[in-house]
């Protein structure tokens, strides 16, 4: 995936929002490019979690569209979006090996398996876990 576009996204947990304060997420129109490092910052209750849930497919926005590399994925289910979130405190999947934990984000991005293997082995060397 090369780009995520938020095309005039808004969300309300009210069935028929009529006032400005009914919107959990005010209109967002933004683009993220592949390879960038981004932080989503703001005070409690400003809509950060709502936005992440919309991008990942856990919520469908009340208004607007989400595009992954130009493709409208607004109505796609979470499993069909091929996206994962990396949180401030990353999770290690205890049902996966160290190798598979390192390979997981690369595979989610559709990196060819030969390149996944190369990058994972390089990373294991860097952190002195190649023998494990």
Feature locations, PLM:
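Short beta-strand immediately N-terminal to the Walker A/P-loop
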Residues: 38-39, 85
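The feature captures the beta-strand-to-loop junction immediately N-terminal to the Walker
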Residues: 41-43
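Helix-to-loop junction immediately C-terminal to a conserved catalytic motif
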Residues: 56
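Conserved ABC ATPase "signature" region
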Residues: 72, 107, 114-132
């Amino acid at each position: 995936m090369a780009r995520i576009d938020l095309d005039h996204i808004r969300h309300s947990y009210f069935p028929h929002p009529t006032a400005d304060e009914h919107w959990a997420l005010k209109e967002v129109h933004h683009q993220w490019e592949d390879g960038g490092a981004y932080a989503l910052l703001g005070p409690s209750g400003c809509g950060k979690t709502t936005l992440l849930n919309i991008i990942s497919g856990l919520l469908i926005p009340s208004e607007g569209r989400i595009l992954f590399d130009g493709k409208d994925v607004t109505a796609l289910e979470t499993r069909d979006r091929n996206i994962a979130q990396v949180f401030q405190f990353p999770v290690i999947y205890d049902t996966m090996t160290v190798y598979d934990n390192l390979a997981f984000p690369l595979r989610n991005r559709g990196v060819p398996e030969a390149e996944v293997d190369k990058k994972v082995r390089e990373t294991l060397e860097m952190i002195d876990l190649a023998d494990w």
